[in-house]
Amino acid sequence: EIAQCLVGSEMCIRDRFTHKRVSNARSVLNGIMSYAIEEEIISHNPVSDVNFKQFTYKPVEVQSDNVFSRDDTHKLLNYLRCIIEPYSLAIQLSFYLFIRVGETKAIRWEDIDYNNRLVYLHRQATCERTLNDDLTFSSRKVKVVNQMKGNTSHGFRKQFLTDEALKILHKAKELNPNGIYVFEPNGEIMTTDSFNRRLKKYCKEAGVPYHSSHKIRFYNASTAFDGNNLTTLSYLMGHSETATTLHYLRNVNKRKNDRLAFQNLGISS
């Protein structure tokens, strides 16, 4: 739909799409056109002729309520405590760490330092699809890469393990004592889609509104922020700029210190 608008008129885009959505579509179209030029299907990229400054974009809505609340988080985690399976445990652990879902999926047992109560984040699990010669895409394949989101060194970091986080890992070890990765449902690495499908299922069963795995990071950052620890949070979140971290803040609390930031996550002891 956006592609049709780009080759149409300014009126077609006006106030219908956010700047981010149009920018994402532009990137995809540029990639397709570049491929077509390489294959000598076309000689010129028509997307480069579009003046994107002419468009009036749809304002981004304030989404302060589009995250987990503390009450809903406690309700969900209390419900999940009795469900001992990989997805439940992965969801629970996500509420106790400043972690991306791709990083959660890629945690190996060797990354856990029980003596110092730390987990080291060295990699992420992603899904990739290959563009075929007929311009169709192959089926998705899970791939673990030693490269973090944003392709910067800021993604490589360590996280403190609270008592609750350690309990979750012990349960995961009982389920999967010989696996390479901590969470391996049916002996395979979980996908983000399957993670979110299970999260949605459990939210419904627990009677709380569903939000995606990414919104867990919004909740954790907001819960741990005290007005003074933005730099610390930015490191823990794996961000290269504090401006990115500010985007995640919804509600704030008054606490300071690296490890104390973790004490507010999940269900506080």
Predicted regions and their residues:
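Single conserved hydrophobic/aromatic residue that forms the stacking wall/gate
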Residues: 1-8, 13-15
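Hydrophobic (often cysteine-bearing) scaffold residues that line and stabilize catalytic clefts
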Residues: 3, 21, 25-29, 86-87, ...
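C-terminal catalytic core of tyrosine-transesterase DNA break-rejoin enzymes
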Residues: 20, 38, 92, 96, ...
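Conserved tyrosine-mediated DNA breakage-rejoining catalytic core shared by Y-recombinases
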Residues: 52, 107-171
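Catalytic-site neighborhood detector that most strongly recognizes the C-terminal catalytic loop/helix
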Residues: 59, 125, 230, 237-262
